[in-house]
Structures are given as structure tokens and as C-alpha cells.
Regions:
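A detector for small-residue-rich transmembrane helices and their helix-helix packing motifs
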Residues: 1-241
Length: 241
């Protein structure tokens, strides 16, 4: 099930969401110009390494470019391949604009990065000794998905459902699209191995839950605005994270 777009207009331009997408693309394009060794060094310098963050290990001096805490944020803009980047940016493009519209620019910035921190720490906690860099925006985007599920459970989302050589386009409620995504993260987290890298499913789950909690707080803070927008809009219808 691949979401393509939602039927949920906004009243403002999501400049923060566009900025995040643009910056992630620029960083990835810069990565493409690196040699294999340079890319490895770049990933270890700016990716989030659980054992380094927790003070268990230290990076060599030539790789220690910023503080371990700083890598929580730099890692959110790095991606391990085209599919990793495109998948993350697609979800951000579809779902982030409405949450940014609800929260406003500054609150959305806070929301997005706190969701990313919650996601990162969820992965770190389950494997504090890991020396594998964690990169990707999926955890922070998971927070956006959690918020969207709360604010727009009935919004219609156009999805592509592959059936072997055939595919079907249908519109379904976001609660089913995002619920399916969340369940899939849980299932995959039990099926995957943490020994050699892969996908940081715990970060996805942690980001989603963080977003759920945060949006409830922000909804109280901006209750009047969110309530109006919900009524208006729902009428119509390495470790990679």
C-alpha cells in the first residue's frame, strides 16, 4: 500500500516541510559525490551511533566532528539510498503540510524535531551497545503520521495497491493507511535482526507514539484553530529510519 496524495487542503504554505525535503535532497546529492571511504566517514561522523551517544564508545578524533547529541539531529537529514530518500520524502510531502498548517511554523519545527528525538532514543534504548550509525528521517516523519492519525482520521488518501503485475488505485481513510503502516512496523521489528544494521523499526514506532502524544498537547494549546481546520477539512472527504 503506497500513499500518493491526500484530499486535505491547507490554508498556508508548508514552508518548513518544503525546507526539510529540500535539505534532505541536497544532503543526499552531496553524498553521491563522495568516494566510498568518504561516505563511510561522513556516515560515522554525522550519523547517530547509540554506543557513542551513551558514552560507551568514542569515535576516533578524525571522525569526531560534532557532539554525539548533535548527531541526533544531523542524522535526520541523511539517507542511505534513493529508495530510502524517496519513501521518506513522499510520506513527508503528503502528510506534513496539514500538521504544519495546524501547528504553525515554530510549533511544527518543535514538534518535528522532538518527534525525531523520541524516535532516535527509542532505537538507542533497545540497543545501547550498537556501533552502527543510524540515519534517516523516518522517525520524525513517524511523529507526523501519528499526529495526522489523531487530527485527520477520516481524510481520504489515494493509495496504490500492487497485485503482482497489476495495481489498483483507491481512496481510503487515513486511519487505515496509517494504522497499516504502524502495524507493519511492529511486525517487521519482530521479524528483523538487529545484528547487522537494516531498518530501525523501533525508531519508527517511537516516533509515531511521540507524535501521538505531542499532538494531543499541541491540540490543547491551539484548540480553537485545530478544531476549525478539522471540521473544514474532513468534510471533503546502515540503520535506516
Amino acid at each position: 500500500m503506497i500513499p500518493l496524495k491526500d484530499d486535505n487542503p491547507t490554508s498556508t504554505k508548508p514552508i518548513v516541510s518544503y525546507g526539510i525535503i529540500g535539505f534532505c535532497v541536497l544532503i543526499f546529492l552531496a553524498q553521491l559525490g563522495l568516494t566510498e571511504q568518504e561516505l563511510r566517514d561522513f556516515t560515522y561522523s554525522y550519523g547517530l551511533i547509540p554506543s557513542v551517544l551513551m558514552g560507551i564508545d568514542q569515535l576516533p578524533n578524525d571522525l569526531s566532528k560534532i557532539s554525539p547529541i548533535g548527531t541526533i539531529f544531523t542524522s535526520m537529514f541523511m539517507h542511505g539510498g534513493w529508495m530510502h530518500l524517496i519513501g521518506n520524502m513522499l510520506y513527508l510531502w503528503i502528510f506534513a503540510d496539514n500538521i504544519e498548517d495546524d501547528l504553525g511554523t515554530l510549533n511544527f519545527v518543535i514538534f518535528y524535531f522532538v518527534s525525531g528525538v523520541g524516535a532516535a532514543m527509542s532505537q538507542v534504548i533497545i540497543d545501547v551497545n550498537s556501533q552502527i550509525p543510524m540515519i534517516g528521517a523516518s522517525g520524525a516523519i513517524g511523529g507526523v503520521l501519528g499526529a495526522y492519525l489523531i487530527n485527520y482520521p477520516n481524510a481520504r488518501v489515494l493509495v496504490l495497491i500492487p497485485f503482482g503485475f497489476f495495481s489498483q488505485l483507491i481512496k481510503i481513510r487515513s486511519i487505515y493507511v496509517l494504522g497499516f503502516w504502524f502495524i507493519l512496523q511492529f511486525v517487521n521489528s519482530f521479524l528483523s535482526s538487529s545484528s547487522g544494521g537494516g531498518v530501525a523499526y523501533a525508531a519508527h514506532i517511537g516516533g509515531f507514539i511521540t507524535g501521538l502524544v505531542l499532538i494531543l498537547f499541541f491540540n490543547k494549546k491551539t484548540k480553537k484553530k485545530v478544531f476549525k481546520s478539522k471540521i473544514k477539512k474532513t468534510k471533503k472527504g546502515p540503520w535506516e529510519q
